Amino acid sequence: MKYVCIHGHFYQPDRTNPATGRLEPELSAAPFMNWNERIFSECYGVNASTPIVDGMQNNYHHLNTDFGPTLLRWMEQERPLTYEAIVKSNKQGAGKRYGTGNVMAQGYHHAILPLANPNDIETEIIWGMRDFEYR
């Protein structure tokens, strides 16, 4: 028997203005207000609830994925139903896949770890693991 694994790497940087703590309009994301909303509409949201012949399907249940902590933090606040669908798919997968889910942790930011200094590598990994455990 042959197997295939499809991996989805999902990441959006923190786009908030540090002075205001809010997302500001991004003209290049039109017709949406910002890139988080645009990518959510085109990718993250539709994969959580995809129409199929006999109903709806959560594609995240069938993918191996990693989600950036900054994306999940935004999604937890702004799109909680999709956030919950992602968390739920990982927990459901844990009972079917040797005790582990189908989502894996990633470094906190989108750093290229082999190019980072040892202190930054350790920080990225620790922060990423702690965020993963929180979720």
Regions found by a protein language model. Give the residues of each.
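Carbohydrate-active enzymes and regulators
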Residues: 1-135
